[in-house]
Amino acid sequence: MIAVIFEAIPVPEQKNRYFELAGQLKSELMRIEGFISVERFQSITTEGKILSLSWWETEEAVKNWKKHFMHIEAQVEGQQTIFSHYRIRIANTLKDYSFNKEDNFNV
């Protein structure tokens, strides 16, 4: 399993545009074979910083998303107008385990 960690600081007046684009891309993202899930978070220690954590079955699936035309268009817009900074890390999962005290509790 592959994790893609996207940390970004949007220009304050463009933050909503990032979330709008992410919402528009979600249906395309879900069509990529090997995509598992995505969640977005906001930092409590760095003002304005957001994190997108996506999970993928294979590195090939990540590559297919990277070259998807709508994603490329969104990247260009992000670089030109939305983000003042971003960083992407792609990592293999070394271990994956959890504890469930209740059926609806996941770690």
Segments and roles (model prediction):
Residues 78-82:
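Arginine/glycine-rich "motif VI" loop of SF2 helicases in the C-terminal RecA-like domain
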Residues 1-50, 57-67, 83-107:
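Short S/T/G/P-rich N-terminal loop/turn motif that feeds into the first structured element of a domain
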